[in-house]
Swiss-Prot record:
Cofactor: Ni(2+)
PANTHER family: TRANSCRIPTION REPRESSOR NIAR-RELATED
Protein's recorded name: Probable transcription repressor NiaR
Pfam families per record: 3H (PF02829), HTH_11 (PF08279)
Presence of the UniProt keyword DNA-binding in the record: yes
Residues the entry annotates as binding Ni(2+): 79, 87, 146, 148
S-S pairs: none
Keyword set includes Cell wall biogenesis/degradation: no
Quaternary structure and interacting proteins, as annotated: Homodimer.
Role summary: Probably functions to regulate transcription of NAD metabolic genes. Binds to DNA upstream of the probable nadBII/nadA/nadC and niaRP operons in a nicotinic acid dependent fashion. Nicotinic acid may be a corepressor.
One of the record's GO molecular function terms: metal ion binding
Amino acid sequence: MHMKTVRQERLKSIVRILERSKEPVSGAQLAEELSVSRQVIVQDIAYLRSLGYNIVATPRGYVLAGGKSGVSRLVAVKHAPEEIKEELLCVVRNGGRIVDVIVEHPVYGEIRGIIDVSSEEEVLKFVNLMEMAKTEPLLTLSGGVHLHTIEAPDEETMERIMRELKKKGFLIEEG
């Protein structure tokens, strides 16, 4: 088979695998399944992104963003670093997913980090990873003020999440 055709088939396979997967797919999994190196997968993902595929690298692997059913909302919140776990649990216990965290930086502008948690287990793993890495969370760059993209299966679930964030004093409201 011609080199170009082999790559095109592999690219189609990557998109198909990501479309069908309900969970993030690691580069190592893709490499093994497609019998190529991890580096080839990294290059293929970069190429697919250049073609317009919205492939996001999360701590647990690649996901093809968009096309999900449900509602998504960008939410402004403020809290101390030690309240991260409580904030994330507040969202997942009410049926939501925290996609990312976004902070404003005076020099760099917007800085975005992928969180991608939707269960208590994932929240605990994420918080544990932050503690083990001994790194400052992004919210420390902006005095605790930050944004999250939150996804929920429906508007009713999203409203429940918003009420809970407000009740805990995390939600920044207009006015």
